[in-house]
């Protein structure tokens, strides 16, 4: 149903305030995004990537409201540009909004910084809030991409369970 809209990712990254999360963890010298957070509570974070279409979004929002489920929507710059009213609707419904950022190795650090800034500014302007969560659209990242997000005051977030619905 929602495969056209976005692919859902369930990942544990929300935690009670007493848990400290580190976005700068590294494994063998590679910086890692937040994929989960240690907590004694049984919680999952339901996330959606919004990239191309807004098909089924109203139905999704109705289901989330009916079930009293909070989600985080990671939106690309193009999606935010094409569906600004819907972005505001999602935000006003109490869901978190994060940036869905595409990194490209062919771009210079300055060009990557500009794409991240453009994405952040568009979301911030439309939602009248500060964007601090970022996800890599294709799941690919490197140390410089993680560093750019951290230097902007943001947190890189990925998934740890992939629904694979994008294959349908």
Predicted feature residues:
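Aromatic-capped interface at the extracytoplasmic side
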Residues: 14-24
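Hydrophobic membrane-insertion alpha-helices, especially the h-region
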Residues: 1-13
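Compositionally biased, intrinsically disordered/low-complexity regions enriched for serine, proline
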Residues: 13-14, 30, 153
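His/Asp/Glu-enriched short active-site or ligand-binding loop at hydrolase and phosphoryl-transfer sites
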Residues: 130, 140, 145-168
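Short, Asp-centered acidic motifs that coordinate Mg2+ and/or phosphate
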Residues: 133
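Active-site beta->alpha N-cap acidic-glycine motif
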Residues: 22-111, 115, 120-122, 130, ...
């Amino acid at each position: 149903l929602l495969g056209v809209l976005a692919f859902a990712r369930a990942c544990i990254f929300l935690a009670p305030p007493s848990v400290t999360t580190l976005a700068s963890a590294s494994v063998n010298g590679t910086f890692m995004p937040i994929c989960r957070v240690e907590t004694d509570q049984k919680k999952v974070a339901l996330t959606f990537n919004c990239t191309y279409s807004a098909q089924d979004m109203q139905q999704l929002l109705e289901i989330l409201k009916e079930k009293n489920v909070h989600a985080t929507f990671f939106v690309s710059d193009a999606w935010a540009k094409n569906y600004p009213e819907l972005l505001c609707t999602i935000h006003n419904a109490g869901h978190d909004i994060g940036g869905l950022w595409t990194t490209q190795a062919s771009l210079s650090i300055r060009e990557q910084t500009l794409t991240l800034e453009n994405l952040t500014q568009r979301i911030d302007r439309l939602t009248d809030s500060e964007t601090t969560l970022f996800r890599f659209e294709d799941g690919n990242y490197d140390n410089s991409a993680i560093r750019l997000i951290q230097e902007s005051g943001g947190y890189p977030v990925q998934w740890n369970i992939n629904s694979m619905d994008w294959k349908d």
